Amino acid sequence: GEMPYTIVRIPAVMGWDDPTGRMWWWVQRALDGGAVIIPSERRAVFRTLYSGDAANAFLRVIDSDATENEVYHIAMQEIMTLERWTGLLWAAAGHESEIAYVPDEVIQRQEGFEDYVPPLARPVPSIYNLSRAERDFEFSTTPVEEWVPTTVAWYRDQYHGDGSQGYSHRAKELSLASRWRDSFNTLKSRF
């Protein structure tokens, strides 16, 4: 007969010691407390997945007979905005988040920012239907308010790796955020 299979589709997995550097990109900026630039065209809602929940889900899939020859999407159950995401990260780092929404065109004209796209920043929503996973193997996730603070603490207290992608340009990033905010406020005052 045919070999049984189960396909599990996952989004970007986040957590401590993330080998892709996506989580560190956010946490390093949260720890310094400065503003973050979000391309104004990339503000869509999303779901990510905590690494501990991903590992648990894979184990549950293997242990369930209901998952044979099926395809599942798994992701965190909460739907996130970048505003909520940065708010949680910056709060866990002891800071208040500030976002500068700058058009892609302006960002990419800045030296060193030609490929600037924060992880999870997308132009279209990335929302998976989790109902089959919830039904077939009781998939559930850790609330984001629980795993983000422990993840930020791990990076603050234990991570000794290199700076995150683009962090060598952090001073320019902060300068652009400040210049954009000041220019935008000047424009608003004229109306």
Predicted features and spans:
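Substrate-positioning beta->alpha
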Residues: 20-26, 39-62, 69-70
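Mid/C-terminal beta-alpha module of Rossmann-like enzyme folds, strongest
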Residues: 60-118, 149-150, 161-191
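Generic structural signal for alpha-helix termini and adjacent loop/cap motifs
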Residues: 33, 64-65, 157-158
